[in-house]
Amino acid sequence: MPKFLCSLLLAAGFASAVVTASATESVRKADEPHSLFERYTNAAQDVILQGLKLVGVRYRLGGNDESSGLDCSGFVRLVFKDSLGAQLPRTAAEMSEVGQRIDVSQLKPGDLVFFNTMRRTFSHVGIYLGDNHFLHAPRTGAEVRVENMEDSYWIKRYNGARRIIDGN
């Protein structure tokens, strides 16, 4: 009998610790995303939504604010700063050295995509949206817009991609 009572008390103590740990864990998880996937999704969504708010903003060479206009790297810098608080370098070429290099087959929304538009590599940058589309500030006389990476112009000029968002 004493052995049974000891086992019962031990089991009750263990069950109490498990219930307490589970309750604490569920309270902690209520305030934060439950998985790496959700954290990625939330960060990527923030980047994309911030970028889409700027569709229609005019292009200006060297531009880095919404009111006076944006160039491609100014657009990407502003989006990442406003959505994630991330400070990216000023030029597309410098951005091409940040984050993790990824293959085109591994692209996920929020990744940076790079192109050769000025007869030099990594001279243009945009934000990948998914389904082979990206968001960018294209050129003088144009506005921030969405384009298809499968258009022949972009296919010929594609230089690579970088992942900036952690956990992506």
Listing of model-derived features with the role each one plays in the protein:
Residues 43-51, 72, 76:
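Stable alpha-helical elements in mature extracytoplasmic
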Residues 110-112, 132:
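Structural motif
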Residues 34-38, 57-109:
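Catalytic cysteine-centered active-site loop
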